A protein has these predicted regions:
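Catalytic domains of cell-wall/extracellular-matrix polysaccharide-remodeling enzymes
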Residues: 135-212, 224-229, 239
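Bacterial N-terminal signal peptides
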Residues: 5-16
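Active-site gating loops and adjacent loop-to-helix segments of metal-dependent hydrolytic enzymes
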Residues: 103-129, 264-267
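Acidic (Asp/Glu)-rich catalytic clusters
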Residues: 25-27, 52-58, 75-87, 104-117, ...
Length: 313
């Protein structure tokens, strides 16, 4: 019996890295259920920033992604720099969806003319970006956003895409892949089942071949029936999570006049904030199931370690 732990360790060490799950490579068990709860649209407005900070500090949120072109980006960067243990990624932006609250590119306008509507803002909808813009313009703009965040002192932990612009069409997915490789960052990724349903089964393997890491599953298919449905839908959806790493996202908000003036979704965003920050029931559900909440930082650090090792002769 005394020799069993040593034998187990030896067997563990000879298992090829490729045969291990991402959870195992992070030091967890293959059967563990790990959950990333990401706050999207942070930096969009002051209310969103304050809601995200509250949820990160005393709620269930484990990471957030920032909208660099938006007016309240400097505020959340200042918080991130003062709180380096928090995980902040970039919510890459090529659209500006609200009617009276708009934003445009970080890159020079003459480098991304196809991303601009007649008023000089980003287009409102993803299909408009595909119809008017080009993947090269999307790459230029996304790169400018990442570089601006780095120049501001943000320790970026991951990437995702606002309104999915970089996550649907193959040419834009390749832009997403290029950025992940260039800046050595993990990414939000659709599930294998979703890619297969869309007729694009090879993308997860292509990112993995470049050493890019991403969660095992991504939940993005909830359809709310108003703010009253938010809690019950998440309680059902987060029951019996699969082993491995699952990512979900929310848009945390509070019922301020600012948010009400920006979007008609303010009540749903407020309900998401309450469910994931102040309501004890969802927290208790996750605890009963043994779900472990994690952020993107350990995934990023593992990715960089593995890619650095692979690059050495």
């Amino acid at each position: 019996m005394p020799r069993l732990p040593s034998l187990f360790l030896a067997l563990f060490l000879i298992v090829p890295v490729q045969a291990q799950t991402l959870a195992e490579r992070l030091g967890f068990l293959a059967a563990d259920k790990l959950l990333i709860i990401n706050g999207d649209d942070v930096g969009m407005c002051h209310t969103g920033n304050q809601a995200a900070i509250a949820s990160l500090e005393r709620g269930l949120m484990t990471s957030a992604t920032l909208m660099v072109p938006c007016p309240w980006f400097p505020e959340i960067v200042a918080y991130a720099k003062a709180n380096p243990v928090r995980d902040f990624g970039i919510h890459l932006v090529q659209t500006s969806e609200w009617k009276t609250y708009r934003w445009g590119p970080v890159a020079p306008w003459d480098q991304v003319p196809g991303l601009l509507d007649p008023e000089g803002y980003f287009w409102s909808e993803t299909p408009q970006v595909y119809a008017k813009g080009t993947p090269q313009e999307a790459l230029i703009e996304a790169r400018a956003q990442i570089r601006k965040a780095l120049a501001a002192g943000l320790d970026i932990t991951h990437l995702d895409s606002h309104m999915g612009v970089l996550q649907y069409l193959p040419a834009y997915l390749d832009v997403y892949r290029q950025l992940a490789v260039e800046f050595d960052l993990p990414v939000r990724m659709a599930s294998q089942a979703a890619f297969e349903a869309g007729g694009q089964p090879s993308w997860r393997a292509r990112f993995a071949a470049d050493g890019i890491l991403f969660p095992d599953d991504f939940v993005h298919d909830l359809k709310y029936e108003g703010p009253a449905s938010v809690k019950s839908l998440w309680m059902r959806r987060l029951t019996d999570l699969k082993p491995g790493i699952t990512e979900i996202y929310i848009h945390a908000g509070q019922p301020t006049e600012e948010l009400k003036a920006i979007t008609g979704s303010w009540a749903v965003r407020s309900a998401e904030f309450e469910t994931f920050t102040n309501d004890p029931d969802l927290r208790a559900l996750l605890e009963r199931q043994g779900v472990k909440r994690i952020g993107y930082r350990p995934i990023r650090d593992l990715q960089r370690s593995l890619r650095n090792s692979r690059a050495k002769p």
